[in-house]
Swiss-Prot record:
Keyword set includes S-adenosyl-L-methionine: no
Record flagged with keyword Metal-binding: no
Encoding gene (name): viaA
Organism: Salmonella heidelberg (strain SL476)
Family (UniProt): Belongs to the ViaA family.
Main location class: cytoplasm
Protein name per UniProt: Regulatory protein ViaA
Pfam families linked: VWA_CoxE
Subcellular location: Cytoplasm
Complexes and interactors: Homodimer. Interacts with RavA.
Length: 483
């Protein structure tokens, strides 16, 4: 069967202009205009999706099939182009009958052309074919536009669903343009309103706990860049201003001994006029012991020195993935559970903004894994937030899972974050030893987010940093009072 792409090629119909016109009409639709005004960060993300839209539309036009009636008419037109005028005159009745049977838009005009001219000349033959071709071009263009209109409606429907989802989650997850772009990519999944409302709910809880959000940002961005001396660094000229006494006097600031005749004190000059003291005067002149005025001035000069440049390289501390382990034991239920989930959502926000990965593991009696920064990050986040914290505590399994994950090449610079109240059994010696090896040899950092003030020091001693967020009633009231 004839494809639309082949028909466009045969009739020299360009679909590019129609595709561009359709996309411009889509971008100018009131829904998108209002959305871009409300969420300017997502405008760049949607605009970046335009090449994919164009490719999808071209693919749809390329794979579409032409209706059988139009295919038959096109085949007849192609065969008619090969006929001479006498041969065409012989075939004309069959051609007219075919056009009538196919309900071709050109049927009436073709019949009028033959009936209004008693003699079918070569010029009339050429005119007949030209108008027939024009009719086919109009039909092909109409077919392209119909398909594009169907695709536009479908695309607009999909975009509206994604806009609704992205608009709801943008305040919670989109910190910058990079995060907005990743959020838009994640919104391509099939989600219902009731699903992502769970993220909105925890986003509102996080907004009501600004200290928790601040803690997540401090943890997520705790690595700072540092300058590192570079070997065989080139020499660089440094110019500094140095203050020193000037040779040109400016003011009298005391008396000194010297041999400056022009600055002698009057009593010294008086001794020169006394014959008995003249030799004494010359002796003191030679020994530079004459009393003279001390005149001082100040001057600045430029001092030029060379030294090696010691801060050539800037070693940015790597911002690698997050491997977050969340304690789902019974003691972490209630408000602790809300805080732990909201904290993971805040880390997801940091990961999206900094183009990092965020991997969640729940530990109780077994380990459940979620990746919140992948293409299906929103679905994974919803599944994570739907979990209930009612298990036991097996923190050793959590650390073993972290250690196993860090063996992979893509996790070589990962940061481990353990969220718990740390009311658990002591860690086995082999786990403590392996964690110390990762910290010492591979510079992995282990963070503890303590939800209780009663965590066991023996467990928490293993961490590089301990971030405390006491969820006790007294601490909650104090935080609320400070706000």
């Amino acid at each position: 069967m004839l494809t639309l792409d082949t028909l466009n090629t045969m009739l020299a119909v360009s679909e590019e202009g129609m595709v561009e016109e359709m996309i411009l009409a889509l971008l100018a639709s009131p829904q998108l205009v209002i959305f871009f005004e409300k969420f300017p960060r997502l405008k760049n993300a949607v605009t970046a999706d335009l090449p994919r839209w164009r490719e999808a539309l071209r693919s749809r036009l390329k794979d579409a099939h032409v209706p059988p009636e139009l295919t038959e008419e096109v085949m007849c037109y192609q065969q008619s182009q090969l006929l001479s005028t006498p041969q065409f005159i012989v075939q004309l009745p069959q051609i007219l009958a075919l056009l009538h049977r196919l309900h071709s838009p050109y049927a009436a005009q073709a019949k009028q052309l033959t009936e209004s001219n008693s003699t079918f000349t070569p010029a009339l033959h050429t005119l007949f074919l030209q108008r027939w071709r024009l009719s086919l071009v109009v039909q092909a263009t109409t077919l392209n536009q119909q398909l594009l209109e169907e695709e536009r409606e479908q695309l607009l429907s999909d975009v509206q669903e994604r806009m609704t989802l992205s608009g709801q989650l943008e305040p919670t997850l989109a910190e910058n343009d990079n995060a907005a772009g990743r959020l838009w990519d994640m919104s391509a999944g099939q989600l219902k309103r009731g699903d992502y409302q769970l993220i909105v709910k925890y986003g509102e809880f996080l907004a009501a706990q600004p200290e928790l959000m601040q803690l997540a940002e401090q943890l997520g961005r705790s690595r700072e860049a540092k300058s590192v001396p570079k070997k065989d660094a080139p020499m660089e000229t440094f110019r500094t201003l140095v203050r020193e006494p000037a040779t040109v006097p400016e003011q009298v600031d005391g008396i000194q001994q010297g041999d400056d005749i022009l600055r002698l004190l009057p009593p010294e000059l008086a001794t020169l006029g006394i014959t008995e003291l003249e030799y004494e005067f010359y002796r003191r002149l030679v020994e530079k012991q004459l009393l003279t005025y001390r005149l001082h001035g100040e001057a600045w000069r430029e001092k030029v020195t060379e030294r090696p440049v010691v801060h050539q390289d800037v070693d940015e501390q790597p911002r690698g993935p997050f491997i977050v382990c969340v304690d789902t034991s019974g003691s972490m239920g209630g408000f602790n559970e809300q805080c732990a989930k909201a904290f993971c959502l805040a880390l997801m926000r940091v990961a999206l903004a900094d183009n990092r990965r965020c991997f969640i593991m729940l530990f109780s009696t077994d380990v459940v894994r979620y990746e919140l920064s992948g293409p299906e990050g929103i679905e994974q986040a919803i599944r994570f937030l739907s979990q209930r914290f009612r298990g036991g505590t097996d923190i050793a399994s959590c650390f073993r899972a972290i250690i196993e994950r860090m063996q992979g090449r893509e996790w070589f610079d990962a940061d481990a974050v353990v969220i718990s109240d740390f009311i658990a059994q002591r860690l086995p010696d082999d786990v403590v030893s392996k964690v110390g090896e990762l910290q010492r040899l591979h510079q992995h950092r282990f963070h503890a987010v303590a939800m209780s003030a009663h965590g066991k020091p023996g467990i928490m001693r293993i961490f590089d940093h301990i971030w405390r967020f006491d969820t006790g009633m007294r601490s909650r009231l104090l935080r609320r009072w400070r706000r």
